[in-house]
Amino acid sequence: MPMAPSTIADEVERYLRTGETDPHHAAWPGNGFMDRANRAHEDLRGGLVREVRRLAEGLSHEPLPQADTVALTRGKVEPMVRGLFPRVEQDEVLATLEKSVVFLTSANIEALLLEHGYDSSAWTLANLHLASLGADLLGEDAPRLVGLSEETTCYVSPDYFAEDDPFADFIVHEAAHIFHNCKRATVGLRETRTKEWLLDIGYRKRETFAYSCEAYARVLERATSPSERRALAADYGSTVRISEERVDPAEVAGIVAEAAAARNGWKIILARCAPTSRPKSALQHLRDSVAAEEAARRR
């Protein structure tokens, strides 16, 4: 017996519990796809806002200090940018990163949820906000995050200001992800056939890169001498601090130790997390596809 088609209420409930949506929006009426998509957006995001409001009632997050977010962010990411990019490119990259951080608060969460371009990401941001309140999350499998990086924006929890791990810095961690999410042209840098993204980071090494940058940034911030850098790196490696399944904590500790012993540790981190083979540009993928089609026709 065929299953009954999902109703709008079914789709909203599924979205709230899993973050998943029907890309065709089949449950919604409308004159064509765009009409259905607009109706679905209104119902799904409206339901998300109402559920977040319900779960957050009576709760509050860590207060934000009266600080200039741009100045705070620049101070955190500038050493990383200076160490990873040639001098002629540093100002353009810094201009993007210093404006990249958005702290999720009770004041801005609803607007962000309604305006975000992707349903799944809006759901993740909702859970990030709820976690900062100590509230129940939306679903059993909802991620418990303190930060999320998308394109050139880093969403960060107010818990950033309550973090007591001396080697943690969510801003640096999320900013490090921008380097593989953002194309050079986006920040005004010249692209070439082999240089399309800000940095070439191995796909399986992206979290390793971010965790290594995070820890090394804190080592540099705290150390006053080369010997202190090495001692702090050893201290970092003495305790398992990462629970992320995609990352080997021992590998990160080794990278941080090697970086701390080098003149420019940022270059060490980049080299250790580089792709095993140079990634192809979108143009090269297109050329390969055309060549494959032509070869198939000649057979």
Residue ranges and their predicted role:
Residues 2-16:
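Non-catalytic protein-protein interaction scaffold segments in large eukaryotic complex-forming proteins
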Residues 18-153:
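Auxiliary, metal-adjacent structural segments of Zn-dependent hydrolase domains
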Residues 41-52, 57, 203, 214-299:
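Long, well-structured alpha-helical subdomains associated
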Residues 156-171:
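Short pre-active-site segment immediately N-terminal to the catalytic Zn-binding motif
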Residues 169-184:
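Active-site recognition of the HExxH zinc-binding catalytic motif
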Residues 174-177, 207-214:
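Histidine-centered, metal-coordinating catalytic motifs and their short helical/loop contexts
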Residues 181-198:
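Flexible internal linker/loop segments at domain or repeat junctions
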Residues 195-211:
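Active-site metal-coordination segments of metallo-dependent hydrolases
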